[in-house]
Amino acid sequence: MDKSEQDQLKKEAATKAAMMVESGSVLGVGTGSTVAFFIDALGERKEKENFSLKHIVTTSNRSKKQLEGLGFQVDELADIDQADLTVDGADRVDDNLDGIKGGGGALTLEKNVAINSKKVIWIVDESKLVHHLSGFPLPVEVLPVSAEQNFKRFEEEGLKPQWRLDDNGKRYVTHYGNYIIDLAADPTPVPHGLADYLDHTVGVVEHGLFLDMCDEVIIAHSDGTIEDKKRK
């Protein structure tokens, strides 16, 4: 499958998600190539229908600029009580609809938007599907003051930590001024147990395990089909 065919599949999946958004609702919007098609589809609805949104919050400047370019006003998460729906991508999704996110470094905001949403839908292509969470480093955002100690503890736990670096080879700094340690242990060991360990580790701000958060995944398959999978 070439890129144009893959993009067409992503567009179809994104359009399906866009049709699930109710006019007048509060919407959370993630980021990524498939989400970009989703935003375009929202713009088409705005142009062709009597479609508007009460509030929109997003997890990236890229999505914010795209939305504003289509005439949508983007608000801060602090400006809303709760999103009716959040649509985002994912780096990996397992059979239970649990996932790894944060490959772009915005995991803390992504999780805050997701946790403050009544419903969460992820749009992915089939390359992101796994039976057990694996094949993608798990990002952990840590405070600089205790980052070295966190790194050593992760090493001792056999989690194969790696500093995330920027384009200049320096430690990547998040929007909130923190570092990211990517855990390369593969497959991700006992996701719920690891999440609990990270949640109780001093210095950890947030991690990329999104467990029991996603309600529905729209999947673009290479055979041209679009699958809608819901949490059981």
From Swiss-Prot:
Family (UniProt):
Belongs to the ribose 5-phosphate isomerase family.
The highest taxon in the source lineage is: Bacteria
Question: Any idea which GO molecular function terms this record carries?
Answer: ribose-5-phosphate isomerase activity
* Catalyzed reactions: aldehydo-D-ribose 5-phosphate = D-ribulose 5-phosphate
Outline what the protein does. Catalyzes the reversible conversion of ribose-5-phosphate to ribulose 5-phosphate.
List, alphabetically, the PANTHER family matched: RIBOSE-5-PHOSPHATE ISOMERASE 3, CHLOROPLASTIC-RELATED
The entry's active site is: 110 (proton acceptor)
Which InterPro entries does the record match to this protein? Answer: NagB/RpiA_transferase-like, Ribose-5P_isomerase, Ribose5P_isomerase_typA_subgr, Ribose5P_isomerase_type_A
This chain belongs to the protein called Ribose-5-phosphate isomerase A
Record bears the keyword Iron = no
Name any Gene Ontology BP term: pentose-phosphate shunt, non-oxidative branch
Q: Which CDD domains match?
A: RPI_A
Residues involved in substrate binding: 31-34, 88-91, 101-104, 128
The subunit structure is:
Homodimer.
Write out the entry's keywords from A to Z. Isomerase
Cite the annotated pathway: Carbohydrate degradation; pentose phosphate pathway; D-ribose 5-phosphate from D-ribulose 5-phosphate (non-oxidative stage): step 1/1
Q: What Pfam families does the record tag this protein with?
A: Rib_5-P_isom_A
Entry's EC annotation: 5.3.1.6
Q: List the source organism.
A: Lactobacillus gasseri (strain ATCC 33323 / DSM 20243 / BCRC 14619 / CIP 102991 / JCM 1131 / KCTC 3163 / NCIMB 11718 / NCTC 13722 / AM63)
